[in-house]
């Protein structure tokens, strides 16, 4: 998968911030949507504390590895899917995580059947779609164009 393309998408969808901030749920975050955990050196840092670009890139690369691993768990043939499908699924996984994306059973059936329109229809028929409409619209459009 083209990780540079995924990064560019996620910079649009998640934004990129070189400081610790609180996300919409109140969790400490930095970089490209990186959730700060107790394993991060930034754990306990105050909101507004600067994070350098190298650390943002390292956290993103670590997050990508985790996301791609989760994609392969959820979609056993993930690496065999068309690049654009991989990009859409990885973007959704980055946004929601495996527990939430695993609930998209109709989308998974569509992807497994290589029925991209059915997969897109299932993406639209979700609470996620209503929550992140602009992002979701872009991803649905991409899925339909495969």
Task: Map each language-model feature to its residues.
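Surface-exposed patches in mature extracellular/periplasmic domains of secreted proteins
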Residues: 18-21, 73-84, 122
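Long, amphipathic alpha-helical surface segments
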Residues: 1-19, 25-27, 34-36, 51, ...
């Amino acid at each position: 998968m083209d990780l540079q393309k995924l990064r560019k998408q996620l910079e649009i969808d998640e934004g990129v911030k070189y400081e610790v901030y609180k996300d919409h749920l109140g969790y400490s975050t930095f970089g490209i949507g990186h959730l700060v955990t107790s394993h991060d050196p930034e754990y306990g840092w105050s909101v507004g504390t600067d994070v350098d670009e190298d650390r943002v890139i390292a956290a993103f690369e670590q997050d990508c590895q985790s996301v791609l691993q989760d994609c392969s768990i959820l979609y056993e043939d993930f690496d065999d899917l068309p690049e654009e499908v991989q990009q859409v699924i990885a973007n959704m996984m980055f946004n929601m995580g495996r527990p939430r994306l695993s609930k998209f059973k109709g989308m998974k059936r569509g992807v497994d059947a290589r029925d991209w329109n059915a997969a897109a229809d299932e993406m639209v028929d979700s609470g996620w779609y209503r929550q992140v409409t602009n992002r979701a619209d872009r991803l649905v459009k991409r899925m339909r164009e495969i």
